[in-house]
Swiss-Prot record:
Oligomeric form and interacting partners: Interacts with class II MHC.
Protein name: Fc receptor-like protein 6
Xref: InterPro entries: Ig-like_dom (IPR007110), Ig-like_dom_sf (IPR036179), Ig-like_fold (IPR013783), Ig_Fc_receptor (IPR050488), IL-40-like_Ig (IPR040878)
Species this protein is from: Mus musculus
GO molecular function, one term: protein phosphatase binding
Disulfide topology: C135-C183
PANTHER family: FC RECEPTOR-LIKE PROTEIN 2, IMMUNOGLOBULIN FC RECEPTOR
Amino acid sequence: MLLWMVLLLCESMAEAQELFPNPELTEFTNSETMDVILKCTIKVDPKNPTLQLFYTFYKNNHVIQDRSPHSVFSAEAKEENSGLYQCMVDTEDGLIQKKSGYLDIQFWTPVSHPVLTLQHEATNLAVGDKVEFLCEAHQGSLPIFYSFYINGEILGKPLAPSGRAASLLASVKAEWSTKNYSCEAKNNISREISELKKFPLVVSGTAWIKSNMLPIWLPASLLGGMVIAAVVLMYFFKPCKKHARPETPTLKEPDSFLYVSVDNQRYK
């Protein structure tokens, strides 16, 4: 008797399992709101047209719409609503439960217009100086790929940082002087280019030395000139010491007579 009841119960459950197959989850897009409509579809046995079924919706294995007679769920088009969706159908008494397969839905946000800045320490850029290009897109689904351009030529390789900004460190070249530079941000659904900017004037090595040495040598040369001028002035305009004017010597009368007298005696 007990065995017969078990067999009867198993047969009833097997028949119940055949009342409907596993459901199928499909998606549609609302043309006005761009929201995604999920529909849980199931084929009911024509022999049981009055069978009452209930639907449950899941996202990443978490219930997002609890058990209800509604077979439709609407997901707003937001990036945070991306994930794996699934639905389950069960009978009114809950004895039969069947789940659909997973449906991977991804909501992508277009990348925003990137902002480009140039950072450098030198006041006057010279060949070989280091500069940093910084490009940032404030919105857009990750990953975002960044590329930098100057005069229409790409600098390095595209960058894909984990965040929303990318930077490129580069050495200044002479041909960059006053050329246009820009950056590009791109994700899986869109791409945007920043505004064009003018690269600063790049001075040559000789001009850089002259412009940088002038503030150093100019004060030194002025100081040296002042010292030389002071020495010259001191040399030519120093006060002279007054000396007593020497008296003109006069011949003594006796000596002069003696000399004449001697001569006269010699030639007599």
